[in-house]
Amino acid sequence: MVTGASRGIGAATARLLAERGAAVAVNYHTDKDAAETLVAAIEAAGGRALALQADVTDAARAADLVARAERELGPVDILVANAIGVGARAGRPSPLLRTAPEDALAVVDAQLRAFLHPVRLVVPGMVERGRGTVVAVGASLSRRSPEGFGTLSMAKSALDAAVRTLAREVGPAGVRVNLVAPGLILSELATHIPEPVRAANAARTAVRRNGTPEDVAHTVAFLASEEASYLTGGYLLVDGGTAML
């Protein structure tokens, strides 16, 4: 199951996991056409997928999502928690001193709900079966806080902490929990970022380019695979080397 999978990182991840043999529940919130187009492409390539609408920040709707997914596709063995729950506005710069506390709290709350609701529904089954993996999609700014992104940084920091805690709690049962932390990724959510800013960011990376959804998807797929069986509680940067410069 990939939450927030109709576009960007979520869509690229769902497509790649399907290519590698997974039956994928493609969760979307509002973009039904994009989700169904993705499912059609997966099926045309010989894969198996199902588009399922749900706002995963809502407990009842998340429960319905998981029930439908498991009824149609079987138990969830891989959960990719990609949905942030607040849309593109969370990624728009706003100085922290000009941010109303209730607005900041709303972003943090939505991020944690988008992670915790699916986790609470599928991880107990993983624990019972003695296997399973959760990969959360965070952001590099959870540990590097650029100007104007304090609210999103706080939300992703909370997600980072939740991942580490859950990894410790369910590790003895054979369930792994990791987080990928992308830098600037040129997905649909980055369309509001001016070209000069994109160019400047690319110049700050060691590889001199911005990231793509596929860059993140390959990291997620690795963490979800048996090749990463000894990796849990991990925080994997996918930022082109920006953090080391």
Model-found features: residue ranges?
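Conserved glycine-rich cofactor-binding loop
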Residues: 6-8
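Conserved glycine-rich Rossmann-like NAD(P)H-binding loop of the short-chain dehydrogenase/reductase
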Residues: 20-37
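The beta1-alpha1 cofactor-binding region of Rossmann-like NAD(H)/NADP(H)-dependent oxidoreductases
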Residues: 32, 53-65, 101, 214-215
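Substrate-binding pocket helix/loop in short-chain dehydrogenase/reductase
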Residues: 90-108, 190, 201
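Catalytic Tyr-X3-Lys loop
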Residues: 97-116, 131, 135, 159, ...
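Active-site helix of classical SDR
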Residues: 119, 155, 163
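Alpha-helical segment proximal to the catalytic Tyr-Lys
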Residues: 124, 168-169, 229
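Short, small/polar-rich loop/turn modules that mediate ligand/substrate recognition or access, typified
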Residues: 171, 176, 231-233, 239
